[in-house]
Amino acid sequence: MISSPCAQKSTILIVDDDEDMRFLATVVFEDAGIAVAGEAKDGPEALTRLDELDPPPVPTVVLLDNQMPTMTGLEVAARILSDRPEQIIILFSAFLDPDVIAEAERLGIAACVSKREATNLPAIVRRVVASRT
């Protein structure tokens, strides 16, 4: 598969407490030519990984599950965006109710994606990254 130039330089940090979902997302991104910069199983680990991957712009996108132990994806996003307002975040959740979507928009999260759309993630990442460059 031929990737777009913006996808080739994009990197992803996948944050999800479900190991199978992290694996699926990794396969989907790698098959599309998008590099996975790392994985995290919860919010605190995601924040640590971002510090390890510093300086920005690595990763280009943080893919965040919303329902995780310790911190929700929205809580993690708020922490990330307070330190890195330019960070592109995609909220990826099985449960996207209107309140979650409204809070995501308020925080500046780039997109909210249902887990049922996992195979569409590369196209969504390309679109979001292209809109920010």
Feature-to-residue mapping (PLM):
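Receiver (REC) domain active-site loop signature in two-component systems and cognate sites
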Residues: M68
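Acidic catalytic/metal-coordinating carboxylates
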Residues: D42-E45, T72-V76
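Two-component/phosphorelay signaling modules centered on CheY-like receiver
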Residues: E19-G38
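Acidic, metal-coordinating helix/loop segments flanking the phosphotransfer/catalytic sites
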Residues: E39-V61
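Non-catalytic signal-transmission and effector/linker regions of two-component phosphorelay proteins
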Residues: M1-T11, T119-T133
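Short amphipathic alpha-helix used as the core "switch/output" element in two-component signaling
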Residues: L74-P85
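Active-site residues of response regulator receiver
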Residues: L64-D65
